[in-house]
Amino acid sequence: MKSAEIREAFLRFFEEQGHTRVASSSLIPNNDPTLLFTNAGMNQFKDCFLGAEKRAYTRAVSSQKCVRAGGKHNDLENVGYTARHHTFFEMLGNFSFGDYFKRDAITFAWTFLTSEQWLNLPKEKLWVTVYATDDEAYDIWTKEVGVPAERMVRIGDNKGAPYASDNFWTMGDTGPCGPCTEIFYDHGPDIWGGPPGSPEEDGDRYIEIWNNVFMQFNRTADGVLHPLPAPSVDTGMGLERVSAVLQHVHSNYEIDLFQNLLAAAAKAIGCSNDGQASLKVVADHIRSCGFLIADGVLPSNEGRGYVLRRIIRRACRHGNKLGAKGSFFYQIVAALAAEMGEAFPELKSQQAHIERVLKAEEEQFAKTLEQGLRILEQDLAQLKGDVVPGDVVFKLYDTYGFPMDLTADIARERELTIDEAGFEREMDAQRERARSASAFGMDYNSLVKVDSATEFLGYDATEAQGKIIALYKDGQAVDQLGEGEQGVVVLDRTPFYAESGGQVGDTGFLQAGAARFDVRDTTKTGGAFLHHGVVASGALVIGSPVEAKVDADVQHATSLNHSATHLLHEALRQVLGEHVQQKGSLVDSQRLRFDFSHFEALKPEQIKQLEDIVNREVRKNTAVETELTDIETAKAKGAMALFGEKYGDTVRVLSMGGDFSVELCGGIHAKRTGDISLFKIISEGGVASGVRRIEAVTGAAALAYLNAAEEQVKEAAQLVKGNRDNLIDKLSAVLERNRQLEKQLEQLQAKAASAAGDDLSNAAVEVKGAKVLAARLDGQDGKALLALVDQLKNKLGHAVILLGSEHEGKVVLVAGVTKDLSSQLKAGDLMKQAAAAVGGKGGGRPDMAQGGGVDVAALDQALALAVPFAEQGL
């Protein structure tokens, strides 16, 4: 059976057993901030197992894409060198949420594996482990399923603590836990290794193919296990492992799926496909990289983006080792999409995006890869011992972009190790250097803890009656706030929108009789809305009734900008591609700021397209509609949810232009798209690797921006004695005239330099048979000095030259050495000394170098270094 057939058979089998087929979740966990990547099938069902989430089904089956690279679960260093380690793998799993338990889970697994209708594995090849004290599971296996006792193994607490066992699963120190039973396949006596639980269990003969976890206890802090009222089942079977069994091969890299990727990798690199570890690395890494990029991760220097960058660069290094010339990795994406695109359509829909991202990253790394490898070779040649020092590893990381594990990979091939502790010390020192020395004041608002909740009325009103239920000053609860005091007011009900989803909190005021509180910001903690501000008059007391009034004009302007971000988001996806995801936003009354995932700067025509699309929707003047529904229904309607956001049982779906833009959002918005009036992008740029930022204005602010631009056009026209109609022609004429004058100036400077050269050559002194000339020519730029040094080298014939100039308040230096002397004296070395003397830097070739500095007063001192430099080197 092919891998795709095994996947489909598994899903179909459990559907026939009453399970709901659930699509794989993203590799970016959206409900677990502790998890770097999705690494197991149960991740998306975690809240179901904890009882925090109820779904319409109690039985589920899935084929989950998983990544283990970085963080606690990290297989990266072993990938390519073993038969079964991968950065990406598929986990087939069936799950029960308080439905069936051990008997059915065991029966399902055995039936699927051994039945002639399904996988038809020979029963005598299968071994089973259970937790040492799990007699229930043992009896089901031996008495009901019929597994002989000689192929049953009880595994106890083999990890040094109670319930610390390969066959006892825990979610943490406390919480749901329980025993598990694992099924192993015996590859036969030709392969070394012993059965599970034996001293030789780490061999490759007996391979685990399926794990059934029985969540039947809740462990409390005292270590006591309490039975759960509704036990559950979580299982996992690696698709690659079971494919190897069914295709009668020992290594996962020999299965059909990998054979196709290995062939594509060999073709892209231009090497033979004969089982090299490096080729396996490339074939494995294209899967993790392709899927991560499809799920919204982009290469960067932190978090998930850095893990992706590490994997890409490891693949590039192994391709380089195999002889790859130029970019090759991105060329394998087509084979990946062909192999796995039917099961995971995102690979096909985002193929072009994945290729662009990989190619850009490859090209960036290629600039330093060769140089970094040469530096490493030099350091290894001088190495005494078998440990690469931490400072060398750090230099490669900091200067040449080599992740630590890439250097470790190279060291491993030479039977060397790296000094990880030394590398971390260098990293800590760098962080300390970068850490700001600024002292920050206490954020008292972070101390505010409120048990009460506030009823929000702001979707329908900007004014409301309420009552003060809590007051805070400097983070501490108080009974009243007096005139002039700053603090926080909590009401039982409010029309003020609290900062969320990028939209700033509302401003306005609270009136309590003669007392007035100016609200400068509104935030939220738990269910309570915090009104931050100052008492303008009178005093506020807990229990007092208040009239809450939002600054409606400011809120309205903010709402227009918020609605515009939704239109912009969809426009970006249409113009740039579906890989675009929101990475952050800030919406206030003045402008909007929208951060999104993209790998390159936008072209002017793309920015114009975005403006045209958004303004087209604005002119349609369609109603902005909202609907409250459950998350699954919202997603079925195509509503975009933000990665990393946690959504409750009920979500608010906001639609614009019919189905043009459909997003989950709790913010304040325009009533109709026409209220936005006008949308204008005012800037676009990068804020991080793979993240771009657009700033834009709407409504009156957009009109003001265009009016200001019109005034600038008028002023420019007046400066060149033209008008709006002929401004471009006038400016072109001015620029052309300027180019002509610059050319004439260069010619005059060249003549002056030539004349100066004749005079300067007479000022050279002789040092050990060579002419040495150091001279100061203030007012000359670097270009003029370079030309003059070339001229002087020709005139003097056997010479060392150092020229300096004060130009626009800074020092400019140029050094030259005639070729017959450049093996003894290097211009770059002279420049380093001279530039350092004027507080700057410099360098260059052995025969010509440039530099500069900021200490004009030290220029003469720097020039005086030329003679002793020549004396020492000749």
From Swiss-Prot:
The reaction(s) catalysed by this protein are: tRNA(Ala) + L-alanine + ATP = L-alanyl-tRNA(Ala) + AMP + diphosphate
Superkingdom, according to UniProt? Answer: Bacteria
- Keyword Lipoprotein included in the entry's annotation: no
- GO biological process: any one? negative regulation of DNA-templated transcription
Q: Where is the signal peptide?
A: none
Cell membrane recorded as keyword? no
What subcellular compartments does it reside in? Cytoplasm
Positions annotated to bind Zn(2+): H562, H566, C665, H669
EC number(s) from the headed UniProt entry: 6.1.1.7
Q: Which GO terms describe its cellular component?
A: cytosol
* Keyword set, alphabetical order: Aminoacyl-tRNA synthetase, ATP-binding, Cytoplasm, Ligase, Metal-binding, Nucleotide-binding, Protein biosynthesis, RNA-binding, tRNA-binding, Zinc
The cofactor remark states: Binds 1 zinc ion per subunit.
Q: Which prosthetic group or cofactor does it need?
A: Zn(2+)
User: What's an example of a GO molecular-function annotation for this chain?
Assistant: tRNA binding
- Where is it mostly found? cytoplasm
- Family note: Belongs to the class-II aminoacyl-tRNA synthetase family.
Provide the domain comment.
Answer: Consists of three domains; the N-terminal catalytic domain, the editing domain and the C-terminal C-Ala domain. The editing domain removes incorrectly charged amino acids, while the C-Ala domain, along with tRNA(Ala), serves as a bridge to cooperatively bring together the editing and aminoacylation centers thus stimulating deacylation of misacylated tRNAs.
> What is the recorded function of this protein according to its Swiss-Prot or TrEMBL entry?
Catalyzes the attachment of alanine to tRNA(Ala) in a two-step reaction: alanine is first activated by ATP to form Ala-AMP and then transferred to the acceptor end of tRNA(Ala). Also edits incorrectly charged Ser-tRNA(Ala) and Gly-tRNA(Ala) via its editing domain.
Q: Which PANTHER family match?
A: ALANINE--TRNA LIGASE, CYTOPLASMIC, ALANYL-TRNA SYNTHETASE
> NCBIfam families from the entry?
alaS (TIGR00344)
Recorded protein name is Alanine--tRNA ligase
In its UniProt entry, the species of origin is given as Pseudomonas putida (strain GB-1)
* Source species taxonomy: Bacteria, Pseudomonadati, Pseudomonadota, Gammaproteobacteria, Pseudomonadales
Gene of this entry: alaS
